[in-house]
Amino acid sequence: MFEVVIGLEVHTQLNTKTKIFCSCSTSFGDEANTHVCPTCLALPGALPVLNKEAVKKAISFGTAINAKINKKSVFNRKNYFYPDLPKAYQISQFEIPIVEGGELIIDVNGEKKRIGITRAHLEEDAGKNIHESDHSLVDLNRAGTPLLEIVSEPDLRSSDEAVAYLKKLHSILRFLNISDANMQEGSFRCDANVSIRPKGDSKLYTRVEIKNLNSFKFIQKAIDYEVERQSAAWEDGKYDEEVYQETRLFDTTNLVTRSMRGKEDSAEYRYFPDPDLLPVLVDKAMYDEAIKIPELADEKVVRYQKEFGVKEDDALNLVSTIEMSRYFEDLVNSKISPKLCVTWLLVELNGRLKNGVTIETSPINSAKMIEFLKRIEDGTISGKAGKEVLDYLMEHPSEDVDAVIEKLGLKQVSDDSAIVAIIDQILAANADKVAEYKAGKDKMFGFFVGQVMKEGKGAFNPAKVNELLKSRLA
C-alpha cells in the first residue's frame, strides 16, 4: 500500500488596476498587445516601478493565513527563455518572500486537517502563446500582471484533500477581494507536485509536477491518474525507469498526464537579486492598513449560526461564494425573518438557477427578492403562491412584485367576513364532524382547515383561517 504526498503551487492574479511594474492596464479579454509599454516589452532602458497595491494585497493574504509578514523582502531575476517572456527572465521573489509560513484548516468528510503553507511571494505573470496550425502568436497583454504564488507544504494525502485546500484558498482570496480567482480566465492556476511512498515511510520520493490545472474537476482527475500511474510503475518494478523529476501536462480529453519536459531545479534558473529594484520595505502605515481584513467565510459561518440561528450546513452553503454571502446579508439586513431568507434563497431561488446561471447572474437581484419575501412575510401571498410568483419573476424580472401578484390572481384573502362566510358554510354542511371535534377529536380541525382552503381556492390566508375557525368552533 502506498501513501500519496501532494504539494500545491497556486498562481493567483491580484486584482490591481495596473500591472506590477508599470502602469499598463490588467484588463482581461481586450485586443492582443494593446496593454503594453516599453517595460512590458523589455525595451532597453525601461525600468520597473513596483505597484504598492500588489504589496498590500499580499500582506492581507498573509494576515488571513496567520503567516509571518517580512517587513523587508527582495525581488530576484528568475532566468529562463520562453517566447512569452520578453526579458528572458521573470521578476520574482526567491530568498526573502513577502509572506512566510502560515496555514489553512481544511475539512474533508467532517475531519479537519491543518495544511502548512511554506510561503507566498510576488512575481510578474508571463504573456500568452497562441498556437495555430503553422505558426504561433504571442499576446503580451498579460505580461507583468501581478501574481501571488502560494506554495503549500507537502501535507496533502489525497486528491480530495487537494481540492478541499484549493477551494478554501479560493474562498479566502475572493472574500479578501484581492483576486477574482477566475479559473476560466486563468487568474487562479494550480501546479500539483505528486509523489508516492510505501505506507510508514517518511522519505520523500521523486515528485512529478502537473502544470497549469485550471478546474477543480481536472485537478482531482489529474492527481488520481498520476497516483495510479506511479503506483503501477512501482508494482511492475519500473518505478526508477518511468517515474522521474519532470513536468507533465494533463490531457483533458483522454484524462491522462503526458510528459512535457524535465523539471528544472532552482539552480538552473540562476536566481540573483534584481539590480533595478530596491528591497521592499513595508512601513508601519502600510502594514497597519493592509492587515485590516474583512470577515472571511469561516467567521461568517459562526456568526450566521449565532446571530441568525442558521443551521451549520445552511451557513456553509451561504458562504459557498462571496456573491451568495452578500445576497443573503442583503436579505437579512432588510429585517426579513432569517429562516424565510434561508429557505427561499438556498432552496427556491438557488434551485431555479440552471444552465450556468449563478446567484451573481441571477435575473432576480437581492432588491427584487426583498420585495418578494416581504409579501410572503406580511401574508399578501402564501408560500405555495410564492413559488408561482417566483417562477414568473425568473422570466420577467423587471416587473413589479405587487403587479405580478395581482396579474396572477394570487393575493391572499384576509377579509374576515369572506372567510367566516365559507367557514360557516363548511361547518353547517358537516354538523356530525363538528360534534366529533367538540367531543375531543382534535384531528377534525385539520379537516375543516382543508375544506375552507379548498373552497377558497388557495386564496385564503392560512393563519387567518386558523384563527377564525378556532373562534367559530369555540
UniProtKB/Swiss-Prot annotation:
It comes from the Bacteria. It is an enzyme of class 6 (ligase). Its EC number is 6.3.5.-. Keywords: ATP-binding, Ligase, Nucleotide-binding, Protein biosynthesis. Coiled coil: none annotated. One of its GO terms (molecular function) is glutaminyl-tRNA synthase (glutamine-hydrolyzing) activity. It catalyses: L-glutamyl-tRNA(Gln) + L-glutamine + ATP + H2O = L-glutaminyl-tRNA(Gln) + L-glutamate + ADP + phosphate + H(+); L-aspartyl-tRNA(Asn) + L-glutamine + ATP + H2O = L-asparaginyl-tRNA(Asn) + L-glutamate + ADP + phosphate + 2 H(+). The keyword NAD does not apply. GO terms for biological process: glutaminyl-tRNAGln biosynthesis via transamidation; translation. Transmembrane segments: none annotated. The keyword Nucleotide-binding applies. SMART domains: GatB_Yqey. Belongs to the GatB/GatE family. GatB subfamily. Allows the formation of correctly charged Asn-tRNA(Asn) or Gln-tRNA(Gln) through the transamidation of misacylated Asp-tRNA(Asn) or Glu-tRNA(Gln) in organisms which lack either or both of asparaginyl-tRNA or glutaminyl-tRNA synthetases. The reaction takes place in the presence of glutamine and ATP through an activated phospho-Asp-tRNA(Asn) or phospho-Glu-tRNA(Gln). NCBIfam families: gatB (TIGR00133), PRK05477.1-2 (NF004012), PRK05477.1-4 (NF004014). Heterotrimer of A, B and C subunits. This is Aspartyl/glutamyl-tRNA(Asn/Gln) amidotransferase subunit B.
